[in-house]
């Protein structure tokens, strides 16, 4: 069986021809529909991700994120989080690949670069949570962290909110200053500020930082708007948190992956608190979210392999429409399947 391979060139072509707005809108729609199915019990929650922590002079993690859709296939993302990549290697902080295995034969039917769609699906998932939990008509978005993930957070949230301005804060001034150029396509004013001002001013706030383990919080608990909605995105490994516990204590909290939430993410700080409704629960029953847009809410995002599965579906769909990707014989198909040397 041949494998369809989508490389950076193919993904760039999809974004160019289809347009990033259309692709992001499709992702938001499919993520919402998919998580609603998950909340209704029509598909299974993926297992928690696993992997290796890398210490020493080049810290980071390499993780494996699987999801199986029965009768369709298994999506497997291998992803690396390496916070020194930009300075040391001029590479993105998050790099990886995502593959699709046929559910019956186990053969790899697709393989794609995962850096862009990981950033886009993370934004799309946050947009779904924000649409459910943020005050309708929210106009001010604040971002703590001005890296690659901040770009897709701003893009995705601009598709579900009538944003009028973006506040950006980063401990690296050059990243904050360059952010406006990277999101110029949004045609929104961008103001560089500090974390406390961003927190006090925002209707919606996203934390997307590379804060080290034990280095949080990256924002103060107060002052803030009474209706503030927070998307906590960057707490993606054990011991890493971005939000102050005092903020979490006062908030309605929704998690993306209940099986992961206590090992990673902000819920690490709340060992005695019961998990509330998940994002899947809210998508399946939006009335659960209805009381919360006027009060403090937090979406605790650790990253879901189910969202990766959906994102790969969207990517493959656009690739098929445009005739993109190359078929390659990556896997062994010997002339005699009983003889591994008969290649």
Curated annotation (Swiss-Prot):
Lyase in keyword set: yes
A GO term for molecular function: lyase activity
Pfam families hit by this protein: OCD_Mu_crystall
EC number, UniProt record: 4.3.1.28
UniProt cofactor(s): NAD(+)
Name of the protein in question: L-lysine cyclodeaminase
Task performed by this protein: Converts L-lysine to L-pipecolate, which is incorporated into multiple secondary metabolite products, including rapamycin, tobulysin, virginiamycin and pristinamycin.
Catalyzed reactions per annotation: L-lysine = L-pipecolate + NH4(+)
Source species, domain of life: Bacteria
Activity regulation annotation text: Inhibited by nipecotic acid and thiazolidine-2-carboxylic acid.
Pathway field: Antibiotic biosynthesis
InterPro entries, alphabetized: NAD(P)-bd_dom_sf (IPR036291), ODC_Mu_crystall (IPR003462), ODC_N (IPR023401)
Keywords: Antibiotic biosynthesis, Lyase, NAD
Transmembrane segments: none
Family statement drawn from the similarity comment of this UniProt entry: Belongs to the ornithine cyclodeaminase/mu-crystallin family.
GO CC, alphabetical: cytoplasm
Biological process terms in GO annotation: antibiotic biosynthetic process
Top-tier EC class: lyase
Top-level taxonomy: Bacteria, Bacillati, Actinomycetota, Actinomycetes, Kitasatosporales
Organism: Streptomyces rapamycinicus (strain ATCC 29253 / DSM 41530 / NRRL 5491 / AYB-994) (Streptomyces hygroscopicus (strain ATCC 29253))
Disruption phenotype: Cells do not produce significant amounts of rapamycin. Cells supplemented by L-pipecolate restore levels of rapamycin.
């Amino acid at each position: 069986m041949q494998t369809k391979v989508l490389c950076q060139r193919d993904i760039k072509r999809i974004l160019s021809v289809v347009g990033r707005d259309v692709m992001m809108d499709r992702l938001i729609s499919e993520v919402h529909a998919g998580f609603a199915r998950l909340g209704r019990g029509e598909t299974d929650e993926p297992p928690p991700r696993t992997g290796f922590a890398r210490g020493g002079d080049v810290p980071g993690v390499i993780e494996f994120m699987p999801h199986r859709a029965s009768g369709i296939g298994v999506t497997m993302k291998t992803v690396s989080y390496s916070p020194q990549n930009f300075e040391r290697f001029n590479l993105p902080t998050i790099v990886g690949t995502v593959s699709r295995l046929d559910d019956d034969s186990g053969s790899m039917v697709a393989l794609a670069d995962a850096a862009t769609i990981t950033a886009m699906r993370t934004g799309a998932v946050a947009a779904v949570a924000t649409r459910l939990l943020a005050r309708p008509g929210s106009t001010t978005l604040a971002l703590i962290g001005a890296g690659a993930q901040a770009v897709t957070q701003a893009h995705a949230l601009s598709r579900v909110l009538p944003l009028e301005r973006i506040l950006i804060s980063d401990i690296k001034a050059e990243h904050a200053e360059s952010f406006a150029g990277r999101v110029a396509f949004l045609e929104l004013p961008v103001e560089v500020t500090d974390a406390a001002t961003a927190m006090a001013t925002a209707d919606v706030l996203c934390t997307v930082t590379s804060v080290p383990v034990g280095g949080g919080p990256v924002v103060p608990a107060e002052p803030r708007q009474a209706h503030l909605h927070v998307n906590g995105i960057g707490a993606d490994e054990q011991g890493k948190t971005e939000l102050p516990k005092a903020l979490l204590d006062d908030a309605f909290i929704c998690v993306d992956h209940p099986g992961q939430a206590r090992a990673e993410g902000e819920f690490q700080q709340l060992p005695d608190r019961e998990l509330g409704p998940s994002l899947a629960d809210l998508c399946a029953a939006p009335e659960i979210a209805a009381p919360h847009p006027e009060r403090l809410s937090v979406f605790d995002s650790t990253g879901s392999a189910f969202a990766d599965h959906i994102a790969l579906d969207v990517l493959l769909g656009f690739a098929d429409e445009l005739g993109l990707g190359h078929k390659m014989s990556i896997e062994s198909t010997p002339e005699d399947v009983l003889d591994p040397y008969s290649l």
